[in-house]
Structures are given as C-alpha cells and as structure tokens.
Regions:
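N-terminal basic, low-structured, amphipathic or hydrophobic segments
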Residues: 122, 126-132
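Active-site helical microenvironments for divalent-metal-assisted chemistry
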Residues: 1-116, 126, 137-272
Length: 272
C-alpha cells in the first residue's frame, strides 16, 4: 500500500508540477534559480530536486504552502547567502526527501543502467526507486557523488536527535551535530535550515515556536558564531528577540525608525 501511495504522489507531480498549478516552481524555474553553477552542477541539482519534488508532492507546511518550499528556500540560502557548491544544494533536496521517506534508496538509483527497457534491469531496485525512475525518466539517470550521500546521511542523523530545553543538553546536542558532520558542510547546512525555519516562525503553533527560538538561542546562534557566519548569527538573534521579547523589540525598532527619519531629514536640510 505504501508503494502504491508513493507512486500516486509521483504521478500527481508529473501532471501539475512540484508546486501545483498556482505556482511557478517548475523544473525549468528551479534550474534558473541557481545560475552560478556550471552545467554539471545544475544537472546535479536538477536530479536531486526531481527526487524531492516527487517525494514531497503531497506534503504541506503549517502555512498551507507545499513543503517543497522549505528545501528550496534552504537551498537558496546555501547557494546565494553562504556560497556553498552545487553538491551541498543537492544534499538539501535529498535530505528532505529521505527524511520524509526513508524508504527511498538513493544509492540504488546510482546503480540503474543508463538505458532501461521495460522492467529489465530493475530487479535490484526498491519499489519506491522504481516508481521514481518510471516517473522522472532521464532526470534520475546516474547517481550522486559520494560526498553528497555522506552529507545526506549526516543531516538525516542530526534530524533524529531532539535536544532538551537545558543548556547541558544543548552542549551535548552541539557535540552530536559536529560528530555527525563528517563533512563540516553538514553543520553549515543545518544552520541554513534553521535560518529558513526562523524566517517562517509565524506558521508554527505557539509551543513549537517557543521551542524553536530556545533551540536557536542555545544551539544555532553559537554554532553560527563558531563558524564565522556572522550575518546569519545576527539575523537569528534579531528574530529570536522579536519573538522572545516582542514589546521590547517593537520599542527599539520604533526608536530606530524615528532616529532614521531624523537622520534623513537632517541630511535633506543640509543638502538644500
């Protein structure tokens, strides 16, 4: 039954695209989102996105948007704001696909012959991987570099551990993140993931939101500082303050706006 349901998701994706008729995140527009990569890098991203879009076709976020929006946003942070290479962008998509659907065997996709006639050559594949191949065709031919698989495995391991709301647990969790990050880029991708979540905190229920801002304060802000991601650290601190102390945040931002208006007025008067 699980295989049949999964195949239906893929067929739905084939008909209406990753986001459905109301959005423009098709394979072509995803390709255009990452112009900084060469042809090989874009092909890698296209393959990873095809898997994620099929796997996540029926998943939605708390705001009702398709869940694929989350890995797309994380991938854009990794590419545009941090400057990570294409294999990291591919790892973002594959992580979310396999986190939601651990039955997907990414390494099996790599072993599929370049040309498959009928059902020949598919005997070693899981039903889910066969469904992916049938739905996406040439987009999935070939596999991924070994470092991509390792990054995905690291991200998936980190996703299974849940920190407690204490500083001692936070320190232990930070150590686990580093331990599971055999490739240091895994930690950077996890920070990019958290930044995307923080930018969309409004969609989460209050209890979940409070848990996430506390995790961010204790875990991700210190990690971002350690790695020299100072812009991301500052933004997460700002979002934390906005949700943890909303009244103080509004008072400070209003004062800053008033100061900015005064500065602009004085500048204009000086120019005149």
């Amino acid at each position: 039954m699980r295989t049949a349901a999964y195949s239906n998701k893929i067929c739905k994706f084939e008909k209406i695209g990753a986001f459905g008729c109301e959005t423009d995140f098709t394979m072509d527009t995803i390709h255009q989102r990452f112009p900084q990569y060469d042809e090989a890098g874009q092909a890698l991203i296209d393959k990873a996105y095809a898997i994620a879009a099929a796997a996540l076709a029926d998943e939605t976020r708390g705001n009702g948007h398709p869940f694929i929006e989350h890995p797309i946003n994380v991938a854009l942070i990794a590419a545009d704001e941090i400057g990570l290479p294409a294999d990291c962008v591919a790892a973002v998509f594959l992580h979310e696909a396999t986190r939601k659907h651990p039955e997907i065997d990414l390494r099996a996709v790599r072993s599929v012959p370049e040309h498959v006639e009928g059902t020949a050559g598919q005997g070693t594949l899981s039903p889910e991987t066969q469904a992916l191949r049938q739905a996406q065709g040439p987009k999935l031919k070939g596999g991924f570099p070994e470092d991509v698989y390792k990054m995905v495995e690291g991200l998936n391991k980190i996703a299974t551990i849940k920190p407690k709301d204490t500083r001692l647990e936070a320190e232990s969790y930070k150590k686990l993140i580093v331990q599971y990050s055999t490739d240091p880029r895994v930690t950077v991708l996890k920070i990019a993931d958290r930044l995307e979540v923080m930018r969309h905190l409004e969609m989460f229920p209050k209890a979940s939101r409070e848990k996430k801002i506390l995790e961010t304060l204790m875990l991700y802000i210190p990690l971002a500082h350690q790695l020299g991601l100072y812009n991301i650290k500052s933004e997460m601190e700002d979002i934390y303050f906005r949700f943890a102390e909303p009244e103080q945040y509004r008072a400070i931002t209003n004062k800053l706006k008033a100061t900015e208006r005064d500065r602009i007025r004085l500048t204009e008067e000086f120019i005149e």
